């Protein structure tokens, strides 16, 4: 299938509190066997995964991407959130949209980095509303984060350079040489974010840790061992502590934080597709092991 052999539809969808989110649907040309919703990371937007979606369409999996509130073409104060619960409720709106537009088709969620954090919150609060969840370099614990530094000293609505903000919140001295918190070549990400969006991690990371046994969704947890933003130990901790019976953990050698944009991105896409296909028509798998 050529990369043009799918349909693309864009639009705005209203959230639970009246904000409008920008949604991009890449639908396969044939009858879909699944729908995959992708949520991006902090300061990024949906377009970061333009190339990543093609293999899914080729396997008749419709892909829904959207810009989180305050990011990309979605409404909301730039780089700001009061609480990540707002984003978790937004994700639920997109899940319901995908179900309405694809009746009877299994829905999966893939969240990257901040999107992984939001996806884990959603899956814990609303167990098994989707067939499975993929957490890619998700912010799930705080092995790298200087959590004691939060809240940051700035006014919550004050803007901070994204790299400076991240450097002050993580143990990551090499970030000093970075120009933007994104994959190489991306110029669409926010260069400034508010202190509030960093502060908000403290509450919900602790909540995920306290409620880990409540997460029972089928879950695929992905990380690169060269990730200097979210340590693989976060993924290992979540894997070991989650209440899910069907859980798999994959740590990719030589892969960094933006693993879907990594040279091994095609391999990662293939692994996600295989994992999704294995779960079509199956409600519960036993522990798949590491």
What are these model-derived regions, one by one?
Residues 53-76:
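Conserved alpha/beta-hydrolase
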Residues 112-194:
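Alpha/beta-hydrolase-fold enzymes
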Residues 226-230:
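Acidic catalytic loop of the alpha/beta-hydrolase fold
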Residues 1-28:
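N-terminal cap/lid segment of alpha/beta-hydrolase-fold proteins
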Residues 43-46, 72-102:
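Catalytic nucleophile-loop/oxyanion-hole region of alpha/beta-hydrolase
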Residues 253-290:
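Catalytic active-site module of serine/aspartate enzymes centered on a nucleophile-bearing elbow/loop
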Residues 217, 231-240:
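Short alpha-helix in the alpha/beta-hydrolase fold that links the catalytic acid
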Residues 215, 221-223:
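Short beta-strand/loop motif that positions the catalytic acidic residue
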């Amino acid at each position: 299938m050529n990369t043009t052999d799918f349909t693309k539809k864009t639009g705005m969808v209203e959230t639970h509190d009246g904000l409008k989110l920008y949604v991009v649907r890449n639908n396969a040309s044939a009858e879909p066997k699944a729908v995959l919703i992708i949520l991006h990371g902090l300061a990024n937007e949906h377009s970061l995964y333009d190339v990543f979606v093609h293999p899914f369409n080729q396997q008749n999996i419709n892909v829904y991407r959207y810009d989180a509130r305050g990011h990309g073409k979605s409404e909301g104060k730039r780089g700001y959130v009061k609480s990540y619960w707002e984003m978790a409720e937004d994700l639920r709106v997109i899940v319901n949209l995908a179900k309405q537009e694809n009746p009877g088709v299994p829905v999966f969620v893939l969240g990257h980095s901040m999107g992984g954090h939001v996806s884990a919150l959603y899956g814990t609060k609303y167990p098994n509303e989707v067939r499975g969840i993929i957490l890619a370099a998700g912010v799930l614990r705080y092995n790298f984060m200087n959590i004691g530094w939060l809240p940051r000293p700035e006014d919550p609505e004050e803007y901070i350079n994204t790299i400076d903000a991240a450097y002050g919140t993580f143990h990551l001295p090499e970030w000093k040489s970075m120009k933007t918190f994104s994959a190489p070549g991306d110029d669409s990400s926010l260069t400034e974010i508010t202190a509030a969006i960093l502060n908000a991690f403290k509450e919900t990371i602790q909540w995920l840790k306290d409620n880990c046994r409540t997460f029972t969704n089928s879950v695929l947890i992905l990380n690169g061992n060269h990730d200097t933003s979210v340590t693989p130990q976060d993924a290992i901790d979540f894997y070991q502590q989650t209440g899910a019976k069907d859980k798999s953990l994959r740590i990719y050698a030589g892969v960094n934080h933006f693993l879907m944009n990594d040279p091994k991105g095609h391999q990662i896409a293939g692994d996600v597709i295989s994992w999704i296909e294995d779960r079509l028509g199956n409600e519960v798998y036993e522990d798949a092991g590491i």
